[in-house]
């Protein structure tokens, strides 16, 4: 059997993980009072954002312990199963390296690793693709190879209400954050070579949607042969214009809609929304 493993930065919550047949190792979030919660397990995203709104100090995030990975690998090996692990970009977290180190510590060779070079919605799309390929009967080697190909055509574009969260979390240079936050500008970000990068700026919320749609087209458009994934932090209303754009303007299927989880929400901040998609250049045999 092939087991699909990911981390909670993919924002696949337990109920959906069970439905997809994938396993999720949670990252950790340390709250202002020192309480450590497991991402996607101990608090719902909505509960977390409510707590975050009252924080004077930004919560911190940390990778899982190697022991969690070791235990999973050992159980899979004992059952004779192979593992395909898909993790958030190594440029943004030590989780990928931690997952690989754990395989060495567990002395197993049944794990194939995929650095998504993405995060959140983008990482989640790769995990869903992996589950689909497994259900089609592909081998672990075939799944990993297809994901390596697919991630070259994977994009995440998001509008951020305030870049201060990314700056405080160390995911964006201070000078870029200041420039993006000037004069009521709504900055757009993307993931480029595994890192957070500025993708544009717009004035006000309507302008942010227009800029986001323009960037999507610049990146190759939304491939109708694969699902897309829209994400929000506070309210589903944040993604309504994205749904309208895809369905009414482009004639595409509605995107999947998911709430952005605690780890990524810590850095993106309240009011963030975006879309992950595969571009029209992706072809999978």
Question: What are the residue ranges of the model-derived segments?
Answer:
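Mixed-charge interfacial surface used for oligomerization/domain docking
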Residues: 3, 9-23, 28-30, 34-35, ...
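Class I S-adenosyl-L-methionine
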Residues: 35-85, 89-108
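Local beta-strand N-terminus motif with an aromatic residue
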Residues: 1-2, 80
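Short, contiguous strand/loop micro-motifs
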Residues: 1, 59-60, 86, 117, ...
């Amino acid at each position: 059997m092939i087991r699909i493993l990911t981390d909670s930065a993919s924002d696949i919550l337990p109920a959906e993980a069970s439905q997809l047949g994938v396993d999720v190792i949670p990252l950790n979030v340390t709250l202002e009072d020192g309480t450590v919660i497991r991402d996607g397990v101990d608090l719902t995203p909505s509960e977390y954002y409510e707590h975050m709104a009252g924080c004077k100090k930004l919560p911190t995030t940390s990778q899982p312990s190697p022991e969690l990975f070791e235990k999973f690998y050992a159980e899979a090996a004992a059952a004779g199963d192979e593992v395909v692990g898909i993790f958030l970009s190594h440029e943004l977290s030590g989780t990928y390296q931690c997952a690989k180190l754990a395989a060495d510590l567990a002395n197993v060779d049944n794990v194939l690793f995929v650095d998504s070079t993405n995060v959140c919605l983008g990482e989640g799309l790769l995990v869903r693709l992996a589950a689909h390929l497994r259900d089609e009967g592909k081998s672990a080697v075939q799944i990993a190879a297809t994901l390596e190909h697919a991630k070259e055509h994977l994009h995440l574009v998001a509008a951020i209400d305030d870049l201060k969260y990314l700056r405080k979390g160390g995911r964006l240079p201070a000078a870029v954050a200041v420039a993006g936050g000037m004069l009521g500008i709504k900055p757009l970000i993307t993931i480029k070579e595994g890192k957070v990068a500025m993708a544009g700026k717009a004035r006000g919320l309507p302008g942010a949607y227009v800029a986001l749609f323009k960037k999507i087209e610049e990146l190759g458009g939304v491939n109708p042969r694969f699902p897309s994934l829209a994400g929000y932090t506070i309210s589903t209303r944040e993604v309504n214009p994205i749904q309208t754009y895809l369905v009414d303007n482009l004639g595409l299927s509605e995107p999947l809609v998911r709430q952005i989880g605690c780890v990524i929400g810590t850095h993106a901040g309240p009011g963030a929304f975006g879309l992950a998609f595969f571009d029209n250049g992706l072809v999978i045999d």
